[in-house]
């Protein structure tokens, strides 16, 4: 049977990008995820020259706010992501013309998520106790994009002192060598290897191996012969207060709890 074309939902951080995709793309765009800088994982960099605050995190300003009214004029559905994990945020998104919200952080820490159960429990405990904080690290990711790191006071996680080895390579980028061949390099691989492939040594500073860390998050850390297992590195959106609000005095919660929490102000009880 003929395959059904999947919907193409583009992730954007500006109305200008959305309009360009909708009008000039050589294929159909079915909608947009509008991701703000409060979202977990990778973030779009701030518009303009990169500026850092006193903690070393990128500074976002008015230019980074998406013009949702202009986006709505395209007539395509859109979902708001980044700081949208609350009943109030869902209600506000719908009022602004959004089809809904995209939520990551609340589901990441629910019982059904793939994060290692012990790591998840420890993280929730620190979030509830107020010893966790989210840092937007402009250097951690080899992609060059800012990456949200959930810093935990009592949980050992990967840092940039890790002995470098690149044996998964999911974030490698292609480059053309002097001989015309295509090769692959990663700014988090051993520095001498990266430089030998024509990379700028400045690009290696502060990088972490997200590939190994994120696999370790799932409880499947690599352990090479004679070495300790790879350490995890959790990511989270900025809004830890909503996680605290949902978990309350419990030690965990389900995906169903998340859905009911998010829809509390918009769906009448059965």
Place the predicted regions along the sequence by residue.
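Conserved alpha/beta-domain cores
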Residues: 1-47, 54-58
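Glycine-rich beta-to-alpha transition loops that act as phosphate-gripper elements at the mouths
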Residues: 10-16, 76-89
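Generic hydrophobic/aromatic pocket-lining and core-packing "Φ" positions
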Residues: 18-22, 68, 90-91
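Conserved active-site-proximal phosphate/metal-binding subdomains
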Residues: 29, 37-77, 85, 95-270
């Amino acid at each position: 049977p003929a395959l059904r074309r999947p919907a193409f939902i583009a992730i954007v951080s500006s109305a200008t990008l959305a309009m360009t995709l909708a009008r000039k793309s050589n294929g159909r765009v079915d909608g947009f995820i509008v991701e703000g800088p409060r979202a977990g994982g990778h973030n779009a960099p701030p518009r303009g020259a990169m500026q850092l605050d006193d903690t070393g995190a990128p500074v976002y300003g008015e230019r980074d706010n998406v013009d949702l009214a202009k986006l709505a004029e395209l007539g395509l559905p859109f979902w708001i992501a980044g700081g949208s994990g609350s009943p109030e945020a869902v209600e506000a998104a719908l009022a602004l013309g959004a089809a809904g919200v995209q939520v990551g952080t609340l589901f990441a820490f629910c019982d059904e998520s793939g994060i290692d159960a012990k790591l998840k429990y420890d993280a929730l405990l620190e979030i509830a106790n107020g010893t966790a904080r989210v840092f937007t690290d402009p250097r951690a990711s080899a992609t060059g994009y800012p990456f949200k790191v959930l810093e935990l006071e009592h949980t050992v996680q990967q840092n940039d002192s890790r002995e470098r080895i690149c044996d998964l390579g999911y974030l490698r980028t292609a480059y053309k060598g002097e001989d015309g061949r295509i090769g692959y390099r990663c700014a988090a691989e051993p520095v001498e290897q990266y430089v030998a492939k024509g990379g700028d040594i400045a690009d290696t500073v502060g990088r972490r191996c997200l590939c190994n860390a994120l696999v370790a998050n799932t409880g499947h850390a690599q352990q090479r012969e004679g070495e300790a297992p790879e350490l995890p590195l959790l990511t989270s959106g900025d809004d830890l207060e909503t996680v605290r609000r949902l978990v309350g005095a419990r030690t965990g919660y389900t995906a169903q709890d998340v859905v009911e929490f998010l829809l509390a102000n918009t769906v009448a009880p059965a």
